[in-house]
A protein has these predicted regions:
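Short, surface-exposed, charged loop/turn segments at secondary-structure junctions
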Residues: 16-19, 141-146
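Amphipathic alpha-helical segments within well-ordered protein domains
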Residues: 43, 159-163
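Catalytic adenosine-cofactor/nucleotide-binding cores of aminoacyl-tRNA synthetases and other
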Residues: 123-137
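Short acidic (Asp/Glu) and glycine-rich catalytic loops that position anionic groups and cofactors
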Residues: 93-99, 136-143, 155-159
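Histidine/acidic residue-rich metal-binding segments in metalloenzymes
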Residues: 1-127
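Gly/Ser/Thr-rich active-site loops/lids in small-molecule metabolic enzymes
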Residues: 35, 145-160
Length: 163
């Protein structure tokens, strides 16, 4: 099972990470719990059934820790992270606007640090681009209307990962 862990009832109409940046910009945030509750639920199901769970694009400290604990317990779980989720924080939204609107959203520095630690200690199994390009005219819209995703730049991902 490959899972994009997001609880739509919590992320509904959110456009960036819930926190100080969202408050400063007056934007509705997507809470970490939107990801965390789904990771917790699906780890329980995987452990109970013996199914293999692959969690796509982890982005929160708590989700990384839950996967770490699940692996220690013998749960058949793997996960991936994206280059933007271990190199950029939600502060990038203030500078880049809708070009930094993605799902899951860019998270806090604490979350980024946890993702980096997860890569370093082997909790994270692979790095994936989660490539979701959009035309510049679509990303030029306001936050409510601009799609989630990054404009092109697939060719830059390897350079980001290697630095």
């Amino acid at each position: 099972i490959v899972d994009h862990c997001e609880d739509p009832s919590q992320s509904f109409r959110g456009v960036i990470n819930e926190g100080a940046v969202a408050e400063r910009l007056g934007l509705r945030g997507i809470p970490n719990t939107s990801e965390d509750v789904c990771v917790a639920r699906d780890l329980i199901v995987a452990e109970s059934t013996g199914a293999h769970l692959h969690v796509a694009h982890l982005s929160t400290a708590r989700a990384v820790e839950m996967v770490r604990v699940g692996k220690r317990r013998g749960t058949r779980v793997t996960c991936e992270v994206t280059p933007h989720h271990f190199t950029l924080t939600d502060e990038a939204v203030a500078e880049h606007g809708t070009h930094a609107k993605m799902n899951p959203p860019l998270r806090s520095a604490k979350d980024v640090e946890a993702v980096v630690t997860g890569i370093a200690d082997g909790t994270v199994d692979c790095i994936a681009t989660d490539h979701a390009p959009h035309a510049p005219e679509l990303k030029a819209k306001g936050f409510a209307d601009a799609p989630f995703g990054v404009i092109g730049e697939l060719e830059k991902r390897l350079a980001v990962v290697r630095t």
